[in-house]
């Protein structure tokens, strides 16, 4: 069972996620160095080249952020010991247990 949990933590640590959020602003100015698309008030504005975009008045901006988890491995103070066909988890310190719990909580 513990081997599965550790493998699950490793799998979760490599997972990427996209999050969409929005901001309500009164005015918006941005410089776009290349072609891109910006969503403003649920409408897509297409930028075809380098330009400064200015929007006056209240508007809602959508942002899609890709959160990429840093590759991780099993912490050095956590080992899996195989004995008599049973898996045992040996935590050398409480810090190891805290780190594993923090990794689990961070990705829920």
From Swiss-Prot:
UniProt name for this protein: Cell wall protein PGA48
Presence of the UniProt keyword Metal-binding in the record: no
Originating species: Candida albicans (strain SC5314 / ATCC MYA-2876) (Yeast)
Keyword NAD annotated: no
Induction annotation: Expression is induced in high iron conditions.
Glycosylation sites: 18, 41, 77
Propeptide feature: residues: 85-108
Membrane topology: Lipid-anchor; GPI-anchor
Compartments it resides in: Secreted, Cell wall; Membrane
Signal peptide (residue range): 1-17
Any single Gene Ontology cellular-component annotation: side of membrane
Entry's family note: Belongs to the SED1 family.
Disulfide bonds: none
Function: Cell wall protein that plays a role in adaptation and resistance to cell wall stress.
Lipidation sites (GPI-anchor amidated asparagine): 84
Keywords: Cell wall, Glycoprotein, GPI-anchor, Lipoprotein, Membrane, Secreted, Signal
Post-translational modification as stated in the protein's UniProt record: The GPI-anchor is attached to the protein in the endoplasmic reticulum and serves to target the protein to the cell surface. There, the glucosamine-inositol phospholipid moiety is cleaved off and the GPI-modified mannoprotein is covalently attached via its lipidless GPI glycan remnant to the 1,6-beta-glucan of the outer cell wall layer.
Gene: PGA48
Main location: secreted
